[in-house]
């Protein structure tokens, strides 16, 4: 009687506190199931079989679960359902399962919580830790990711040290576990994310995940598609690529027509248009649609660049940038345009290039309606409306709205001219200037000035030149009233008032008000004279000197004095001559007060005070104040040699 009473009480407790199959089942929707690869589906099937069999082995009278009954009505899961049901009811464990249904006798005991109990009692002795679930739901905002039903519960286990199930026997050992089948894990070490990356410090739950992550540092992509040659870091990505029919991208964005082969990429892209930003940077407040973008962005603030190129040592903040960079060394250009055959090292460059053929300009300015083929060009254009110029020159303080303009400007300080003409050796700051120069050499110059005969291949250069003759003034100096036909000329002139000389020679430290003056000066150090007279072979440092020299051969004197009719080859000669009529002497010596009409005469006079004699004869060492005296002296040595 006593034994029957205990058995009845045990059965009653079992009904009240038992763990049913649905408590340990993992449920998937049709959409979620479609995203699983073969390995994941097999794992799912094995886990579900093990869960059901373990519950059955505890002696609990189970019928076909409601979950499995549902599966039988869903056609996409037919194969797995059939295998699962057959594995439970008709497979190798059927005999043991039926035996457990027929008997309530105690079977082999098992060590749980340091105490030996029977399988008959297991179902009673362990229950759901309801206090864990209550605290779990109170803190469901822990990471901002939304889940539904049991998916949320499973996800929240990652945030908790505790697991779902605890020992019901007064919780003597305080030990917990997450699933009924894993009873052996009670004594297992529960330390999480024990595998850490030595490169960036990121931690992972298992060694295989760490191994996959390390490939992002090394750039290793062991899984390559034989059809298109595309390689992948991860086997799952490779499998997904292989399943996707060639060139098929069924997920198309209606906003910008960009297409995707994967629904998850499409959803992440859509967040860009709708402005949905789940992840926000605490440093600057910038929002991102996915966590990986935020992680990469944070490295801008920290300066962290964990991905380093082994070829040149250059480091990058994200693995994709390193992968693109490596193609510079390898010369690999896997993305080819089907229209013109041009190849690119990155898919984004190909997408932008294709828009040249299609004429597509998806990025439109909301201010003026102007459209662009690249988002970066729209960003730069937007600054013309806001006036923002974030890229500032450290040498002279001039600011620009895009980095390329700053890079070009910096060449004026350094004197760098990377674009050189193969015909004459002349170098330029800009590729466009070189292109114009090359065209000028190979084509006619139809735009000829009627005043001085100078010809131009470009109409804009011709119009600017004509203003010099016509006196058509557009830009006036507010300091002295002097006027100019070009804004750049006014800018340079203003520096004569401010004393600013932003362009400094690195050889001797001498500074200049314009970059062109610095360029000419640098040639005095290098000895370069790129402009040569075809008549006599004499070479000059700058083109204007060659043009003036050519007039000695042609006899041309385009600059005529209106007072006396005397003509000159150079405009500066006419300016000095005109002062003879006006009596103007603007160059005054601070030492003695003597004034001069010509700057060269003034400089010669100043040397009489300082004793400077810059023109020295290499034959005898004698020095002179002015170049005319020096040239006269050199001729005396040539006569002696004759």
UniProtKB/Swiss-Prot annotation:
Family (UniProt): Belongs to the krueppel C2H2-type zinc-finger protein family.
Gene Ontology molecular function: DNA-binding transcription factor activity, RNA polymerase II-specific; RNA polymerase II cis-regulatory region sequence-specific DNA binding; zinc ion binding
Domain annotation KRAB: ranges: 19-90
Biological process (GO), any one: regulation of transcription by RNA polymerase II
Main localization (coarse): nucleus
Listed name of the protein: Zinc finger protein 699
Keywords of this entry: Deafness, DNA-binding, Intellectual disability, Metal-binding, Nucleus, Repeat, Transcription, Transcription regulation, Zinc, Zinc-finger
Zinc finger (C2H2-type): 195-217, 223-245, 251-273, 279-301, 307-329, 335-357, 363-385, 391-413, 419-441, 447-469, 475-497, 503-525, 531-553, 559-581, 587-609, 615-637
Purpose: May be involved in transcriptional regulation.
Organism: Homo sapiens
Subcellular location, record wording: Nucleus
Assigned GO CC terms: nucleus
Disease: DEGCAGS syndrome: An autosomal recessive neurodevelopmental disorder characterized by global developmental delay, coarse facial features, and abnormalities of the cardiovascular, gastrointestinal, genitourinary and skeletal system. Other common features included anemia or pancytopenia, immunodeficiency and recurrent infections, and sensorineural hearing impairment. Death in childhood may occur.
UniProt cross-references to PANTHER family, sorted A to Z: ZINC FINGER PROTEIN, ZINC FINGER PROTEIN 850
InterPro entries: KRAB, KRAB_dom_sf, Znf_C2H2_sf, Znf_C2H2_type
Pfam families hit by this protein: KRAB, zf-C2H2, zf-C2H2_4
């Amino acid at each position: 009687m006593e034994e029957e009473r205990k058995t009845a009480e045990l059965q009653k407790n079992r009904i009240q506190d038992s763990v049913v199959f649905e408590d340990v089942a993992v449920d998937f929707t049709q959409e979620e199931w479609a995203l699983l690869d073969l390995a994941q589906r097999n794992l799912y099937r094995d886990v579900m079989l093990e869960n059901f069999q373990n519950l059955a082995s505890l002696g609990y009278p189970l019928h076909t679960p409601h979950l499995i009954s549902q599966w039988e009505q869903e056609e996409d899961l037919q194969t797995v359902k059939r295998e699962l049901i057959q594995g439970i009811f008709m497979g190798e464990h059927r005999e043991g399962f039926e035996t457990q249904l027929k008997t309530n006798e105690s079977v082999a005991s098992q060590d749980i919580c340091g105490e030996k109990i029977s399988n008959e009692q297991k179902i009673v002795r362990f229950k759901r830790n309801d206090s864990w679930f209550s605290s779990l739901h109170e803190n469901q905002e822990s990471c901002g990711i939304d889940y539904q039903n049991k998916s949320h519960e499973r996800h929240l286990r990652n945030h908790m040290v505790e697991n779902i199930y605890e020992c019901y026997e007064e919780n003597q050992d305080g030990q917990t576990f997450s699933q009924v089948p894993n009873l052996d894990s009670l004594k297992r070490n529960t330390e999480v994310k024990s595998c850490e990356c030595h490169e960036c410090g990121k931690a992972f739950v298992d060694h295989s995940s760490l191994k996959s992550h390390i490939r992002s540092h090394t750039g290793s992509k062991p899984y390559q598609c034989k059809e298109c040659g595309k390689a992948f870091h991860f086997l799952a990505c490779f499998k997904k690529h292989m399943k996707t029919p060639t060139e098929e991208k069924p997920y198309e964005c209606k906003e910008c027509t960009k297409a995707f082969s994967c629904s998850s990429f499409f959803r992440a892209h859509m967040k860009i248009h709708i402005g949905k930003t789940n992840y926000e940077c605490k440093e600057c407040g910038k929002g991102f649609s996915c966590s990986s973008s935020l992680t990469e962005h944070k490295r801008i603030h920290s300066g962290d660049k964990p991905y380093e190129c082994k070829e040149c040592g250059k480091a990058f903040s994200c693995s994709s940038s390193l992968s693109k960079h490596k193609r510079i060394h390898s010369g690999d250009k896997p993305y080819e345009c089907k229209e013109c055959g041009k190849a690119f090292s990155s898919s984004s460059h190909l997408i932008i290039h294709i828009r040249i053929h299609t004429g597509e300009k998806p990025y439109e300015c909301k201010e003026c309606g102007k459209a662009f083929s690249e988002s970066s060009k729209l960003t730069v254009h937007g600054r013309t409306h806001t006036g923002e110029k974030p890229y500032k020159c450290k040498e002279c303080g001039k600011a620009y709205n895009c980095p390329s303009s700053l890079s070009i400007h910096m060449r004026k300080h350094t004197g760098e001219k990377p674009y050189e003409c193969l015909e004459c050796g002349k170098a330029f700051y800009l590729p466009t200037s070189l292109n114009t120069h090359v065209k000028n050499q190979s084509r006619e110059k139809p735009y000829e000035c009627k005043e001085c005969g100078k010809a131009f291949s470009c109409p804009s250069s011709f119009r600017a030149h004509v203003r010099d003759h016509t006196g058509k003034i557009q830009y006036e100096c507010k300091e002295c009233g002097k006027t100019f036909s070009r804004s750049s000329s006014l800018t340079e002139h203003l520096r004569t008032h401010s004393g600013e000389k932003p362009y400094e020679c690195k050889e001797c430290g001498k500074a200049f008000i314009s970059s062109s003056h610095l360029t000419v000066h640098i040639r005095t150090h290098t000895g370069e004279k790129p402009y040569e007279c075809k008549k006599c072979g004499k070479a000059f440092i700058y083109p204007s000197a060659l043009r003036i020299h050519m007039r000695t051969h042609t006899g041309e004197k385009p600059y005529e004095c209106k007072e006396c009719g005397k003509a000159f080859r150079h405009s500066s000669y006419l300016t000095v001559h005109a002062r003879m009529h006006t009596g103007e002497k603007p160059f005054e010596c601070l030492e003695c007060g003597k004034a001069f009409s010509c700057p060269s005469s003034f400089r010669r006079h100043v040397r009489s005070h300082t004793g400077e004699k810059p023109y020295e004869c290499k034959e005898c060492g004698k020095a002179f104040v002015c170049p005319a005296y020096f040239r006269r002296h050199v001729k005396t040595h040539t006569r002696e040699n004759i």
